[in-house]
């Protein structure tokens, strides 16, 4: 069972309040609006956003606001149900109005507010419900509101994803959503991370970029990149600790959240780690691992508990030699520690491969060097098709 701090996520950290409410934006009546407030004396923010060219209005807005000044950033408002993507100028105006409403409700400059949305693309925000919901949310902020906030940002997720990490003299908490459209870069996901570490804006931004590159950008559930992917880091500075190893601690926190996202991938029965080892360089190993992770044939084989190494090497073979050099006659493949391919040919018995747990570890040894890289993915099942066929578009 999770400890209370882990369940609280963003509010497990000194200097933060949050809430999650049902504003009526979702027909189901479930929670759909979250608000996170940094009450610390030294507020700083950082952000990493989708590279999708159809980036949603809240992404464009938050990216622009952060670029003009991350110091003093105090709040994030997040809604589920409407992505506010591909909504034109009105969508951007609605995002600005959302930030202004939060600023008014919390008595702060709207430029201290970041905005995130998730849900249906092309659906305008129901601004009447959004604006009235913001007033309710502002009055509902609590130091114990992190759990409710984590529920309010979900779409097709089965459960919220929250973490708490105790570092040396400071803490990091977080919440994330995402079960489908998980693919670099980032990997649809929204994530808010909080810390009481004392950071400057440059340190926070650099640390977040490194952490995302090593975790969320190595998560590829279904090869589909969202228009709304956003990771926000808020630092309160309440610990007074200027950390020396913050990037490593933040990376571990993000890794825990990435694993939770993979474990809750739409319809998945297996969470799969694909490691490409003995590569000439890490960049090539990473591209090879990502290529294998996006193969529907590999993913369906794993869904059927079939250690089909032929599909793996076939996909590996599509990676250009200039990108990932290796000799096919030296490649080996292991499923859950059991070798099924050695030196580019069948080896051992596929029946020896255990598939008795959700976790599947796939290792591809290139025999070309000492570098390695890994990605997280999942299998592809009938349930994934049902979920996405039934999700209104």
Question: What is each residue range found by the language model?
Answer:
Residues 2-79, 83-96, 103-393:
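A structural signal for small-residue-enriched, beta-sheet-centric alpha/beta enzyme cores
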């Amino acid at each position: 069972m999770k400890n209370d701090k882990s369940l609280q996520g963003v509010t497990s950290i000194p200097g933060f309040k949050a809430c999650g409410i049902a504003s009526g934006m979702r027909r189901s009546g479930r929670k759909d609006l979250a608000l996170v407030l940094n009450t610390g004396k030294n507020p700083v923010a950082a952000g990493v956003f989708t590279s999708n060219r159809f980036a949603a209005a809240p992404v464009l807005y938050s990216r622009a606001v952060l670029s003009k000044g991350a110091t003093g950033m105090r709040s994030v408002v997040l809604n589920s149900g409407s992505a506010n993507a591909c909504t034109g100028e009105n969508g951007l105006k609605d995002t600005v109005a959302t930030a202004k409403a939060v600023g008014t409700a919390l008595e702060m400059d709207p430029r201290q507010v970041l905005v995130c949305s998730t849900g249906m693309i092309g659906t305008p925000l129901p601004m009447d419900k959004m604006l009235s919901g913001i007033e309710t949310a502002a009055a509902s902020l609590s130091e114990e509101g992190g759990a409710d906030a984590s529920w309010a940002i979900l779409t097709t997720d089965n459960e919220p994803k929250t973490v708490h990490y105790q570092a040396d003299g400071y803490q990091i908490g977080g919440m994330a959503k995402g079960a489908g459209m998980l693919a670099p870069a980032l990997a649809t996901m929204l994530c808010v991370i909080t810390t009481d570490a004392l950071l400057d804006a440059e340190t926070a931004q650099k640390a977040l970029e490194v952490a995302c590159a090593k975790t969320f950008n190595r998560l590829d559930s279904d090869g589909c990149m969202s228009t709304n992917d956003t990771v926000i880091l808020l630092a309160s500075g309440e610990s007074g600790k200027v950390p020396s190893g913050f990037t490593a601690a933040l990376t571990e926190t993000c890794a825990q959240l990435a694993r939770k996202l993979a474990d809750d991938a739409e319809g998945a029965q297996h969470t799969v780690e694909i490691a490409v080892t003995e590569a000439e360089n890490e960049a090539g190993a990473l591209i090879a691992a990502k290529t294998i992770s996006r193969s529907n044939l590999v993913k369906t084989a794993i869904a059927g508990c079939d250690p089909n190494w032929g599909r793996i090497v076939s996909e590996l073979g599509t990676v250009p030699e200039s990108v990932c050099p290796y000799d096919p006659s030296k490649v080996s493949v292991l499923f859950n520690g059991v070798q099924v391919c050695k030196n580019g040919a069948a080896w051992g018995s596929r029946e020896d491969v255990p598939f008795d747990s959700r976790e599947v570890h796939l290792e591809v040894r290139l025999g070309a060097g000492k570098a390695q890289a890994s990605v997280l993915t999942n299998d592809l099942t009938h349930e994934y098709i049902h979920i996405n066929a039934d999700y209104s578009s």
